[in-house]
Design a protein with these regions (language model features):
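Sequence/fold signature of self-assembling virion shell proteins
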Residues: 2-37, 48-53, 57-193
Length: 193
């Protein structure tokens, strides 16, 4: 479907390829480089590709995609981060529980898919963000004054007669933003229970 409320299927190789076609049509560049196989047993070449991030609830669905290569079979074992799950065609997947779904946001409850813990609710909708190089940017604004430290030395009081508790806090600056909307795509899927 085209509306979030009609989502009732897991990610498929066809849907992934449609997302990749969209990025390529916008001339998005790959983020990762080729990883060559090694003489070690059962290692494989990994194509250059885009990066996709999603909830770890989708691990099983991604692993079941045709052509999935787990990180354990990467030739050089060079991962993007500790949470990289694997690669399918020219997409490398990073999964983590921090990427949460829209609970009960999809089609009517179906025992096949996760439904936010409520047996009467709708299917949970999981976003998959896929992006190319320089689709977004971020920077910590730094110089000698970027970190502002606040220190409150301990003082004796009725609640702290020995003056043992003080506080220390810091503030800093950070900026991020989308640099090219055409180089980021979002697919919305259900996750198999």
């Amino acid at each position: 479907g085209t509306a979030r409320a009609s989502v009732a299927s897991a990610i498929s190789i066809g849907k992934q390829r449609a997302m990749v076609r969209t990025l390529k049509a916008q001339r998005a560049r790959f983020i990762t480089e080729v990883l060559a196989s090694t003489p070690n047993y059962e290692t494989r070449n990994i194509e250059p590709g885009f990066v996709a991030v999603c909830s770890s609830d989708m691990d099983g669905d991604i692993r079941s995609l045709s052509g999935f290569v787990p990180v354990a079979e990467y030739g050089k074992r060079k991962t993007i981060c500790d949470f990289e799950l694997g690669s399918v065609d020219d997409v490398r997947y990073i999964t983590h529980p921090i990427f949460s779904p829209w609970l009960n946001g999809g089609a009517a409850n179906n025992a096949t898919f996760l439904c936010g813990g409520a047996s009467t609710g709708a299917i949970d909708v999981y976003p998959v963000l896929m992006f190319g190089e320089e689709a977004f940017g971020h920077t910590a604004l730094r110089d000698m004054w970027a970190l502002d430290l606040k220190h409150s030395p301990p003082k004796a009081s009725d609640s702290d007669p020995a003056g043992q508790r003080g506080s220390l806090a810091a503030t800093s600056w950070y900026r991020c933003g989308i640099l090219n909307q055409g180089w980021i795509v979002r697919g919305e899927f259900a996750a198999t229970a």
